[in-house]
Structures are given as structure tokens and as C-alpha cells.
């Protein structure tokens, strides 16, 4: 269980947001309200997707690092950077995929960044990009939700995240108008079970504390909530007397939300998953003496310097993860309606040892 400072305050704020009905409307994160921009068409989205796939495939087949980073941003850029480190170390590769025919969810929006979602079946070709760290195994072939963004009228379209749905999980129907555009949901909307911008903190409370968390009243159990909690508990093995902690926390990356057909929200967001094994004196701010050797999991080795001495004080790891979650409408007749986290992407990005 995690007990890092700030977790209780974050949970209190998130639970207060659940069921809130008096919050004024606001625009999605990063959107400039009131400006007029042309809508993204299906043809344009198709061109952006095809261009990305062609460049990514060429980069993966040649190992060209500059090309691999040329059309990505946000979570995806950090993920690719880590894959390149894994490839250089020989423990992974720049992941190469084959894609099926995409379907596009085009939001009705004003201002920048402009964005859209490509939903497509993706199959891994060859080695995975880098060793996993969540303990969750996703199939080599599965449906992914790809978020593409354009930061300004003159900026290129870039892929900002790719989140895969576990087998058996589906995306809910969205609220499209007669032209096929989907309504967005303000991140502080009170029309859902929880404000969309509270989805991440509520998920984090369950990942940090498990089924006993108060947030479990509004967040459904599953692979990407209680499953991450269960995996985190055994991800590292602390020596006798040392402490092991983990925390799912927010990031500076923009969140987006689309309205579902039933009035809920499909929310896209990113979180850091931090974990650490350390001698108690570090947490307690006491006199620090070296402890017994800390076991370094094999999947972290490529992120540490070669010849790194066995850590005896602290071992840190960080993952940057993208998620998609379904936030049901407020006042849903079923008392069992909860936030469902349906997709995950990203992975390990950092480790240190002392």
C-alpha cells in the first residue's frame, strides 16, 4: 500500500468531484475557446493516419531514431525514446506494427490543439518495443485508440498516445451528430458520475490502495485498476527492513473527452506510475546508512548505467502510461454503474539506483 504525501488530499478532491452537478462548463484542456478553426474531415484524418503508419514502419524497419521521433509527441514520444534505449541495449526493439482499416472519431471542436481518435486493430511484427513493467500482458494483436494532435494551424499532426484495449473490452457508442462529428465533454462537466478531470485521480486511488480504497465505490475493478494494484504489489522485492512504495499520479499532458451516446464521457489522459524500494531512513529523513542489496528486476536493467553497483539505498522506477476510461452519466439507473478504465499504453521511461 502507498502512503506518500498528497495521496489523501488528491483522493478527497476526486471523490468530491464524483457526482458534482453545479460546476460551470469549461473547454477541454488545451483548447482555446471562442476561436474558429476548420473541422478535421475523414479524408484529412485518413491522410494523417496513413502518413504516420508509413513513417513509423520505415523507422522501425531501418532503426532510424530521428525518423521514429519525427511524427510523435507527448506520451508516444517518450515511449518511443525508451524503445530506442531498449534497442540500443539489446533488450528490446523499436516496435513494428501492421494496422487494419481505421475508424475515426472526429470531435466537434474550436481552437487548438485540434485532435482526433483513430480506432484500429494493430498487430505486433517481431520483438516488442521494450520490457514491460506493469505486469499486465496485452495481446500482440488488439484494438488500439490512437490520439493525434495538431498544436497550431501551421504545426504538423503528431501521434500523442496509443492505448490498447484488453481482449473482450469494447469502446462505447459515441454521440455523433448528423455530419458524423462527436460532441466533446468539458473536463469539469457535472453531467457524469465524476468530473472527467477526476477520472485519473480516482483510478490512482484504486491502483495505490486496491479494492479497499473509498474510490472503489465509483471505479470498477479490472485489469487496469485493481489489476495494476495487484501487479504493483509484486513488481519489486524489498530486502528485509526496506520499504516498497508505489503511486499513480497525474501528468502535465492534456486530457480530452468525447461524449458517449448515453451522456457519459470517454476520457483520454496520462498518468505516471512511480515505484521505489528504499531504506526507511530516506523516507523518515533520518541518518541514512546502507542496507542490504536491493534486487533490480531484469526489465529495469536497460535503464540503468552499465556496471551500476548493486543498489543498497534506493531503487526508483517510473512509467508513463496513457489511458482511456468510460465515465458513465450522472444519475444512471443502475447503482452498479462505475468508471471503467478500458485501454492502456506507454510504459517504462526511467530508473535510478543508489
Q: PLM features: residue spans?
A:
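Solvent-exposed loop/turn segments at secondary-structure junctions
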Residues: 75-76, 124, 166-167, 273-275, ...
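Surface-exposed, charged secondary-structure patches
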Residues: 87-141, 242-296
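Long, glycine/tryptophan/cysteine-rich extracytoplasmic
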Residues: 33-36, 97, 302-307
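N-terminal export and membrane-targeting signals
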Residues: 1-10
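Bacterial signal peptide processing site
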Residues: 21-24
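C-terminal motif of bacterial Sec signal peptides marking the signal peptidase cleavage site
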Residues: 15-19
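Core segments of small alpha/beta cavity-forming domains
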Residues: 36-88, 169, 174-244
